[in-house]
Amino acid sequence: MKNTFVYQAEKPVIKLLQITDPHLFKDESAELLGVNTQASFAQVLKEIQQENNEFDVILATGDLVQDSSDEGYIRFVEMMKPFNKPVFWIPGNHDFQPKMAEFLNQPPMNAAKHLLLGEHWQALLLDSQVYGVPHGQLSQHQLDLLKETLGKNPERYTLVVLHHHLLPTNSAWLDQHNLRNSHELAEVLAPFTNVKAILYGHIHQEVNSEWNGYQVMATPATCIQFKPDCQYFSLDTLQPGWREIELHSDGSIRTEVKRIQQAEFFPNMQEEGY
């Protein structure tokens, strides 16, 4: 996989921060289903910084901007600068990749999709976007890159990162927008015993589960939340959040989802979709 980033660290634990689905707009006052996404994202970042936790790497797992605007991507970059840590990104279904390539190319942003993290771990960032539609699919090119990279680093524990979800949410309206070829992903991963976990966003809710023996993690959006186990489109009153991950030298993972505590953002519960 091209664009390899090497994070040299002799310490036994690598600490990651995942933020996902900010859905920023050109207009800072714009709302998504009743929530000002600029304000909610700013609040998430503020509370992360107040914790004073030292992260090694930040993962931004898609749907960074809702309306393909230059201003949205420029503002995202500016808002990430205070962390002074490399920020790696993947596209979500709402993102416009030409704009991502244009604006997410300056520090702290980094376009690498293969991260060598310390002596024991690697993270592989996959593009599951099918432009113009909500569901996801990994192209044959992405699957081939994944297989090639895993084959070159068989001794490293591996975290696979993408936008779209693998596990059903038990919400019919949302599960039609899943990763359509998860079976092909499973076939590629199967021979590589050091693959430990899969991380994604997209579903605007927390998941800590298992799929084919891999730990599976999904993370709340920094804006609106989708209510699980609902046949029809439903919003939740849970607050915006983020995920912190520790990758240990023995291959184990410790992780925690946190949500904002110092403010409240409530969507318009009467909305029937977006």
Swiss-Prot record:
Molecular function terms, GO-annotated: 3',5'-cyclic-AMP phosphodiesterase activity; metal ion binding; nucleotide binding
Tell me the InterPro entries matching this sequence: Calcineurin-like_PHP_ApaH, cAMP_phosphodiest_CpdA, CNP_phosphodiesterase-III, GpdQ/CpdA-like, Metallo-depent_PP-like
Cofactor entry: Fe(2+)
Give the residues annotated as coiled coil: none
Q: What is its EC number?
A: 3.1.4.53
- Output the SUPFAM superfamilies linked to this UniProt entry: Metallo-dependent phosphatases
From the UniProt annotation, give the residues forming the signal peptide: none
Catalysed conversion reaction: 3',5'-cyclic AMP + H2O = AMP + H(+)
Q: Does the keyword Nucleotide-binding apply?
A: yes
Q: So where does AMP get bound? A: H23, D63, N93, H94, H204
List of residues binding Fe cation 1: D21, H23, D63, H204
| Keywords recorded for this protein, A-Z | cAMP, Hydrolase, Iron, Metal-binding, Nucleotide-binding
The EC category is: hydrolase
Q: Which domain of life is it from?
A: Bacteria
For Fe cation 2, which residues are the binding ones? D63, N93, H163, H202
What's noted on cofactor binding?
A: Binds 2 Fe(2+) ions per subunit.
Purpose = Hydrolyzes cAMP to 5'-AMP. Plays an important regulatory role in modulating the intracellular concentration of cAMP, thereby influencing cAMP-dependent processes. May coordinate responses to nutritional stress, ensuring optimal competence development.
Q: Which family does the UniProt entry place this protein in?
A: Belongs to the cyclic nucleotide phosphodiesterase class-III family.
Q: Which NCBIfam families match?
A: PRK11148.1
Q: Which HAMAP family match?
A: cAMP_phosphodiest_CpdA (MF_00905)
Q: What is this protein called?
A: 3',5'-cyclic adenosine monophosphate phosphodiesterase CpdA
Origin organism is Haemophilus influenzae (strain ATCC 51907 / DSM 11121 / KW20 / Rd)
User: What taxonomic lineage is listed for the species of origin?
Assistant: Bacteria, Pseudomonadati, Pseudomonadota, Gammaproteobacteria, Pasteurellales
